Amino acid sequence: MKAHKIFSIKVFCSIILFLSHNLIYCASEDPIYGKNGMVVSTSNEASLVGVNILKKGGNAIDAAVAVGFALAVTSSGNGNIGGGGFLVARMASGASFTLDHREAAPKKSKRDMFLNSNGNVIPGMSLGTRASSGVPGTVDGLLRVFYDYGSGSV
């Protein structure tokens, strides 16, 4: 019985792997390379916003910020202003930087705010109440990187 179960699991995993073959690899079998820059996102409209920024003399940071805000409108499930993120960048000068603009706990949050007087977790308190909210970091992060590393020309 046990050997049959293991065999069934192996067959199931093999089928899933076979069916997900197209999901594992890139959408195009022939990679596309840009000669003067490239903008890629989950939304054609948002990518075009970034391309237009580059054409107007903006740098990659300007384009990334514009795409980030455009995604909040054109592809809100993939880019939104109610969350946060991470940015890793290398500028043309060779300088690199990172920015953590993830959501943060509200300022009045306390380390033990989800615990009762005995120090035990209050069930559901950290999931389904106003106390469980976080402060989005997307807008602050995009604006901060724009002002600190943008070209200043758009």
Tell me what each language-model feature is.
Residues 26-48, 52, 60-154:
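Noncatalytic scaffold domains of N-terminal-nucleophile
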Residues 10-22:
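Bacterial N-terminal signal peptides
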Residues 1-7:
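N-terminal secretory signal peptides that target proteins for export/translocation
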Residues 5, 22-23, 117:
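Short linear motifs in intrinsically disordered/low-complexity regions
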